[in-house]
Amino acid sequence: MKYLKRYIILISIFIPGFLNAQDTICKLKGQMDGYAGLNIANPIKWQTGARLIPSFSIGKTWKTNLKLDAEISVNSFLDYQFSDWKSIGSDYGIRPYRFWVRLSSERFELRAGLQKINFGSASMLRPLMWFDRMDPRDPLQLTDGVYALLGRYYFQNNANAWLWILWGNDKTKGWETIPSSSRIPEFGGRMQIPVPGGEAAISFHHRTADLSGSVNPLIINGSGTYPEDRLGLDGKWDLGVGLWTEYSLIHSELDTAYFQPWTKLFTLGMDYTFGLGNGLYMATEFFRYSNANKVFDPGVNKTFTSLTANYPLGINKLGGILYYSWTDKSWYRFIDFQRQSDNWTYYLFLFWNPDRILIYNTGNENNMFAGKGIQLMAVYNF
């Protein structure tokens, strides 16, 4: 929160310029949702809650096509979980969700503040999920942002270059299990270029991880912080069917025998829309996650295959996601039915999964999608 104050000061510098401009455009929009779920466990568990995310944006465009805009939004939420009609947990609060200011033109943008940064070609099992935690099962695609300065430049041949600096982020993000040091900036970049039939990209990121408060200090040699470097490769092609691949190589210079220094993540996927009725969309991905002591060692692997499908039915849509773990021979099943009505969207979810979710690093051990159950959700967009 102390770093948020600095970004508030940054954005407040630009507010007088917005207010003094007659052609300034202001918008207030947002999203409100309520949900209730039942988990068929022993004993039976159920969950209910609500969320409100209002978003205020303000922007001004000059005759030179230079644009200055900002967005402020908060995530206010209330969640209760029960077992045998007795409360077993609750969570509520108001947290900053997005808080950024941006200067942009037709070919570049520079954005500073609390923002979402995500990229890559995969859709379900994403090795390049470095800064977000979007879950493909979540229809709202909510994810916390990161405090960052992000610059992007778009070339005439559709290539684009990214540079970023992150600072003040003391919680884990993406696939991380150890948070970054909030006092030491992280930095990286990405270059994406067009290739025959599609596009390809290379990404890099460097951070300093902080073990204090995460593991037993007796097993660590040195200060408890260590550098980590990431290299990412991805590509996507339209060859009649959609094909994509992602690869992430992570090296941690940690002086202890309790952690393996190399992490490798790989995804290969494809999708196609069949001309059946209103159009049946299907996609599949193969994913492998491994840790090793040396970069070319096979290490300890976790392997998953995923399949997703959706079919539109007028104002309704039926979809599903299926995962199979080749490591422990387990299935993850998720079916959703969606109905759209003006500003309202209604969802019905059915799930049948192992008692412990091992796919996504959400940081939440009490996952209501674990086991078997049903969930209802209503969403209002304004």
Where are these regions (language model features)?
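Transmembrane beta-barrel architecture of outer-membrane proteins
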Residues: 31-33, 49-53, 93-98, 144-146, ...
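Outer-membrane beta-barrel "beta-signal"
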Residues: 307, 368-382
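Signature for the C-terminal beta-barrel architecture of outer-membrane proteins
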Residues: 24-28, 63, 67, 107, ...
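Transmembrane beta-strands of outer-membrane beta-barrel pores
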Residues: 34-40, 58, 62, 72-80, ...
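Surface-exposed strand-loop-strand hairpins of Gram-negative outer-membrane beta-barrel proteins
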Residues: 35-51
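Outer membrane beta-barrel
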Residues: 59-161, 166, 193, 355-357
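Outer-membrane beta-barrel architecture
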Residues: 53-57, 99-102, 150-152, 190-192, ...
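C-terminal structural cap/anchor segments
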Residues: 278-334, 338
